[in-house]
């Protein structure tokens, strides 16, 4: 049911288009609960306590609920969205792919708690050749810096191309990836981690002397990004 924007809905309420438990309501600020029967324009309105969305995040957008200066992932949901929606975890500004959005705090916790050991799988393009030695280092756990040593992770090497293309590069907002990949060639890989540290995948490859030039999250646990979703679109 399309009920319009918040402004349009308030106008409709004032005109008496909404009934709650059989009584006409004209105050847009009237509070309802999950047991109330709500009728809008003659049709029942179902109540959903929790909402869950899969968003295919594009590059150049920050993972936040609001920001005065930059576009956020919640801006894709428009004015009609529930005000208690928030992203589950985060993706870097220049990282694309699977992002879950919900108002279910328990769901947030189950996916993000380190104790749950939830897999997060990424597809990436790397400047230069990724080899078996790199895979073994990922498997053992990579020392990133004096503060962070990554837990063992699964690295899958899908292929290597000697001739990189401009289209191989993400919209690099804050990456250190050099354009030398146009000369060095590009490796296509997938990596599975169970952590979610700041810039983790980029930092792990940087510790091996390699740079990520494109990064896309494709799976969280058993939830796989719908390949039919265009970047910047979402579904329930």
Please give the residue ranges for each predicted region:
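Basic, flexible Lys/Arg- and Gly-enriched helix-loop patches that mediate nucleic-acid binding at interfaces
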Residues: 1-236
